[in-house]
From Swiss-Prot:
It is found in: Cytoplasm; Nucleus, Nucleolus. The keyword Transmembrane does not apply. SUPFAM superfamilies: Ribonuclease PH domain 2-like, Ribosomal protein S5 domain 2-like. This is Exosome complex component RRP46. Keywords: Cytoplasm, Exosome, Nucleus, RNA-binding, rRNA processing. Disulfide bonds: none annotated. The gene is RRP46. InterPro entries: ExoRNase_PH_dom1 (IPR001247), ExoRNase_PH_dom2 (IPR015847), ExoRNase_PH_dom2_sf (IPR036345), PNPase/RNase_PH_dom_sf (IPR027408), Ribosomal_Su5_D2-typ_SF (IPR020568), RNase_PH (IPR050080). GO terms for molecular function: RNA binding. Component of the RNA exosome complex. Specifically part of the catalytically inactive RNA exosome core complex (Exo-9) which may associate with the catalytic subunits RRP6 and DIS3 in cytoplasmic- and nuclear-specific RNA exosome complex forms. Exo-9 is formed by a hexameric base ring of RNase PH domain-containing subunits and a cap ring consisting of CSL4, RRP4 and RRP40. Gene3D superfamilies: GHMP Kinase, N-terminal domain.
Amino acid sequence: MSVQAEIGILDHVDGSSEFVSQDTKVICSVTGPIEPKARQELPTQLALEIIVRPAKGVATTREKVLEDKLRAVLTPLITRHCYPRQLCQITCQILESGEDEAEFSLRELSCCINAAFLALVDAGIALNSMCASIPIAIIKDTSDIIVDPTAEQLKISLSVHTLALEFVNGGKVVKNVLLLDSNGDFNEDQLFSLLELGEQKCQELVTNIRRIIQDNISPRLVV
């Protein structure tokens, strides 16, 4: 899986990142911890406000669903008790979807997850662990399992999946499956096969993410 990523690309926010995978491109910004509105405040932990903006037009129910899935992935990663009565705003702007938006959202969701994690790191938010997410498709005629499928491969897919895994011990150990979002027809054997392949590819991606973080943050450190 070939990706490009950069952190600290935006001014006037606490953290930001850009994540590109094939034809899908996402920019994410993080602001916080900041003072929340009264209705958003949580007495003992950090509150999250997550916004996903589409590449074209205004946000619809589709983006609200993406926001809910993104929240489910990011919440376990953040050490929220460190920031009681505070708010963190996470905004993902999709620049290029790289897929048919009327039918699919897995590529966008996967890139939003990876971009949000990098932006949280850039913002200095305390995290419990790392995460990496990949899109997967099972092709209709051959039943081949394709990681990071193209828009053309998605159109001939039998099922599509977004996998997000939580990593600990420097990205070497999988702690938890944060998300497995599936749509389409598949059997149990195919599910186990894609999880096995997905774990391997997520491991490679999290290693790449660690390198990106190191390359971007090391120059800022005062030795």
